[in-house]
Amino acid sequence: MASTVRPSFSLGNETLKVPLALFALNRQRLCERLRKNGAVQAGSAVVLQGGEEMQRYCTDTSIIFRQESFFHWAFGVIESGCYGVIDVDTGKSTLFVPRLPASYATWMGKIHSKEHFKEKYAVDDVQYADEIASVLTSRNPSVLLTLRGVNTDSGNVCREASFEGISKFTVNNTILHPEIVECRVFKTDMELEVLRYTNRISSEAHREVMKAVKVGMKEYEMESLFQHYCYSKGGMRHTSYTCICCSGENAAVLHYGHAGAPNDRTIKDGDICLFDMGGEYYCFASDITCSFPANGKFTDDQKAIYEAVLRSCRTVMSTMKPGVWWPDMHRLADRIHLEELTRIGLLSGSVDAMLQVHLGAVFMPHGLGHFLGLDVHDVGGYPEGVERIDEPGLRSLRTARHLEPGMVLTVEPGIYFIDHLLDQALADPAQACFFNQEVLQRFRNFGGVRIEEDVVVTDSGMELLTCVPRTVEEIEACMAGCDKALAPSGPK
């Protein structure tokens, strides 16, 4: 009797079971889009190449492998050195796996059969990668659709599939990229379940960090605790990006944590902490930022800046719904920040006039948020016809699209006191006239506050995926060990 067990990925214990049907549905969605494209010939085949193992420079020390995202989206394969082919007309899938030498069994473990991979990944056929040219020749596709296109966040070109003998086939490398990117923009219900999981585990890890942080600790101790929780409780071997664990003036460094500033400052009494960290499960990302006082109690100035950012974050989320233009949400956050900084007394004058001279970008030079999925800055932000807005702040926005159901984005407003941006503003008469320099001086070494939530656009609003303490009262209670269990808010 045939097995009724549906293939799934899980790392055991309490980790999420991800059905391989998720990837079968993705392949189906891609084929349906391609068949509607008038430029796609009958008999076309999609060819994707997975990631390769990499070594550290010239050594034989392997870097932990993580699958290439487009290949993972279509096949969910965790092994390196694979290819995938999808028949566009029928939707049938073929996975090509490496033919491993006998010595592999000595050093790396059991060599699995093709049937093993067919069952593991629920594909229609499995062949060896060194036979891809001969297998495709026997199938005689009219054209091979390969992946080539620019990532609008990095400016890098994705790797196009290549194998010995590909020159014998007719190849088109322009059709596939925009179609598969657009598929990735809109998440299925199964994909959303994984993103809910990555957010739940990462949110729990952030709460553990809040409870553990103490004056005198190193920033990297909090990074270590976050990673340990995500891996031990959630099976997350990877983080979605380099952990950003800022304290004090470092909280004004937007992408702190790099090799030259490796989360190595000692946390001091009176510091604000800004911790931007997200765990990754089965290549699905999360991206969460929490800001809180190192000693567990907000000062008046910390509370004022924090609640300004919280107001902008919550106003944006309550305004989000299908049809909303994302740059308008960035401008809304800017307006609220300037209103609040005026209320605090740091600025004075007309907020409309401040917006005219782009004063908001002095305090929030980055974009309000970005797509999230298999990459932390997920693809699809600027498809053909969507132009980047060349204005301070907005030019850093990673998408300028109108919101649609199924899109997953971060909402991450922030207010930062970045010396060189403040100095530039004070040297510009059009901006300097709004500053109360005596009050500004009080905030010069403040750092900054960012609040980052992950949300999915629904038919009527949005669903909040992140569940961490957010109000001043919730944060102080959590840091005192008196927090209560939180849950995502659900659709709005």
Curated annotation (Swiss-Prot):
Reaction equations catalysed = Xaa-L-Pro dipeptide + H2O = an L-alpha-amino acid + L-proline
InterPro entries in the record: Aminopep_P_N (IPR007865), Creatin/AminoP/Spt16_N (IPR029149), Creatinase/aminopeptidase-like (IPR036005), Pept_M24 (IPR000994), Peptidase_M24B_aminopep-P_CS (IPR001131), X-Pro_dipept-like (IPR052433)
Q: Which residues make up the binding site for a dipeptide? A: H255, D287, H377, R398
Cofactor note text: Binds 2 manganese ions per subunit.
Example of a GO MF term: metalloaminopeptidase activity
Q: Output the Gene3D superfamilies linked to this UniProt entry.
A: Creatinase/methionine aminopeptidase superfamily, Creatinase/prolidase N-terminal domain
Keywords of this protein's UniProt record, alphabetized?
Answer: Acetylation, Collagen degradation, Dipeptidase, Hydrolase, Manganese, Metal-binding, Metalloprotease, Phosphoprotein, Protease
- N-acetylalanine PTM positions read A2
Indicate which residues the UniProt annotation says bind Mn(2+) 2.
D287, H370, E412, E452
- Please provide the Gene Ontology terms (biological process) for this protein: collagen catabolic process; negative regulation of programmed cell death; proteolysis
Which residues, renumbered to this chain, carry the PTM Phosphoserine? S167
Which Pfam family, giving just one, matches this sequence?
Peptidase_M24
Keyword Zinc-finger belongs to the record = no
Q: How does it assemble?
A: Homodimer.
The family note in this entry says: Belongs to the peptidase M24B family. Eukaryotic-type prolidase subfamily.
- Matching PANTHER family, A to Z? PEPTIDASE D, PTHR48480
Q: What does this protein do?
A: Dipeptidase that catalyzes the hydrolysis of dipeptides with a prolyl (Xaa-Pro) or hydroxyprolyl residue in the C-terminal position. The preferred dipeptide substrate is Gly-Pro, but other Xaa-Pro dipeptides, such as Ala-Pro, Met-Pro, Phe-Pro, Val-Pro and Leu-Pro, can be cleaved. Plays an important role in collagen metabolism because the high level of iminoacids in collagen.
Indicate what this protein is called per its UniProt record.
Xaa-Pro dipeptidase
Give the organism the record lists: Rattus norvegicus (Rat)
Q: What is the lineage of its organism?
A: Eukaryota, Metazoa, Chordata, Craniata, Vertebrata
